[in-house]
Amino acid sequence: MSQITTKHITVLFRRWMAIICCLIIKIAYLAY
């Protein structure tokens, strides 16, 4: 149970990190 939850959280965390990175790159690209 805990292993599945941890894996799910890790997947969501990586997904959010990817989205945030994309937003930062877009903002930096527009800024410059």
Curated annotation (Swiss-Prot):
UniProt organism field: Yersinia enterocolitica
Protein name: Yop proteins translocation protein A
InterPro entries (UniProt xref): DUF5463
Keyword field: Plasmid, Virulence
Additional note from the record: Belongs to an operon involved in the translocation of Yop proteins across the bacterial membranes or in the specific control of this function.
A Pfam family reported for this protein in Swiss-Prot or TrEMBL: DUF5463
Expression induction or repression: At 37 degrees Celsius in the absence of calcium.
Name of the encoding gene: yscA
Superkingdom, taxonomy of origin: Bacteria
